[in-house]
């Protein structure tokens, strides 16, 4: 890029030195602003909503024409003396041997050699320039964005043969940074063009890049841009009152920003943020600057400091939390550009650039553990952004080399020991699973590792029936894996995937719902990791606003308005990000007619339990009689492969059991599920028994699942052979005994009263 810009400058100097005249080209009056070369705006692809046109400039260059080939033949060599003993020798004969004539002509045109000096000095008068020269640094330069390999840690090459030599699974080693960087920025495009909405201040630049675009709901605004090794830029486009407004924000290495045309200088004209290594600049017109200043009033220096003084992963997590706020407050999809959304998109793009800069400045090798953490968070950020900006497009930031490295690491991971890992080591493993997620050969081990982590989280959860912050973070990582895996697998064809959904559903109960809605209701906990709920991975389909409000109001000191705010926020998040869909299940093919009636699905190895509001013809149906008045509820056992049930179909009564004997050394209830439902609100929760510890905790006195004081809650036990029983515990026995004793006492009192009356009457 620098060589190209230098050649353009030389062309201009050559014209000036020999007094020649270049080829004529009219000044562009309609800036070309397509999303990517040759593409138009479509849903899910880059582009712009309308044909962009700008007001023609009043100053136009004088058209001149000359044969540049003839000029080169007359002056085959040119010496340019820039002073300070700096000279450049330009041999045109050698140049035309390497560069096609058409390209030389294009460079000649972009050098604007036909312009008069007066026109050159005046053509940028409408381009916005700062009033004062930027003098003081914005913050200070830090290297927190760089993933350096620690002393003593090994380095590996990433060729197909050598990648297998990797022995570590924890990412504490280095791999070649230039190779990874080439993968992440693999596309080649015209990143900058004179006709772009950058007001003709740049030369054409073709470079390796990643590209993105986001639209707003009003279809009149769009933001799009590129990420390269040297810089990244975002152009905001707004259609207002029949005119397009443009604002380009660029961030990059100070000494590697694209060369400006003419007499424009970054430091005196455009810089809004700078430290010892990076700079942020804005490019627009005076009129457009006034428009965007009133519309979004951006804090460029604050954005610059955040991006350059904090680790990229920290900034990315903050952006993820902002997405939660937009979802919970019903602002998704984003309808229009505002200060919040404008700054979000800038940070979104420049966070990707800082990840690139971390690779660029890491030297020869980059630390895998740190790199995977950043790329994992960026992947999640892109997925969340896609739910809030419609349409959203992103191309780039994939790497086959990284996938190969991650696959070897997954192979080396001692999955059976994952339950003994610290939270930090689990974080690293889950990030590795995400990077290896697109490798088909690694699928089985990825799901196995995820299931082991889920099982351990669930087991620990039953000790206190409370999810720790670290555990919610790990559930989030598994959730990200499921967003991809659900497209490739069906639950009952993979035991580990089934365990993941069963344990997630078991942690989605009334306590969990009220906890999350309570945090969202105070509007101060828009944290993705604090508010992430296993309900987003459950196979429950009974979530409604009214149900969530009902669960939330059970909390003390919870007003109806707060409960409604929290429940609405949780409902919006569930609607946007709930990964479990009915079509995911193989059994869905024979239950399509009942899709609207299904409340919950409980998959087991050979059969599937379906909780619904209607009986299912091909299964064994258990009519739940003690249910709420508004709707009926059935628990149906259906063969997972949609075959005929061995014992035939039909409706059966649910037998009642008062006492369950549990072995102290074995786990007779393992593989069974317990279902709780309320007479008024219906389905409450489900718990699946995975091991003895879970079995013991479910029946402990501290368990909130069996509420001995609530006479309106009922419990069913679902066996893996299709049998369903109702459990009536001690509270039912105590109720019956209480009623009998009460009747006996009342009878005695009535008898005594009657005897007293007879005695008085007789006497």
Swiss-Prot record:
Sites carrying sugar chains: 67, 84, 91, 112, 136, 148, 157, 241, 557, 606, 641, 659, 721
UniProt membrane topology term: Single-pass type I membrane protein
Organism superkingdom: Viruses
Keywords on record: Fusion of virus membrane with host cell membrane, Fusion of virus membrane with host membrane, Glycoprotein, Host cell membrane, Host endosome, Host membrane, Membrane, Sialic acid, Signal, Transmembrane, Transmembrane helix, Viral envelope protein, Viral penetration into host cytoplasm, Virion, Virus entry into host cell
GO CC list: host cell endosome membrane; host cell plasma membrane; membrane; viral envelope; virion membrane
Signal peptide: 1-22
InterPro entries: Herpes_gH (IPR003493), Herpes_glycoH_C (IPR035305), Herpes_glycoH_C_sf (IPR038172)
Keyword set includes Membrane: yes
Topological domains, Virion surface: 23-739
Similarity annotation: Belongs to the herpesviridae glycoprotein H family.
Record HAMAP family: HSV_GH
Function of the molecule: The heterodimer glycoprotein H-glycoprotein L is required for the fusion of viral and plasma membranes leading to virus entry into the host cell. Following initial binding to host receptor, membrane fusion is mediated by the fusion machinery composed of gB and the heterodimer gH/gL. May also be involved in the fusion between the virion envelope and the outer nuclear membrane during virion morphogenesis.
The protein, known as: Envelope glycoprotein H
Annotated source species: Equine herpesvirus 2 (strain 86/87)
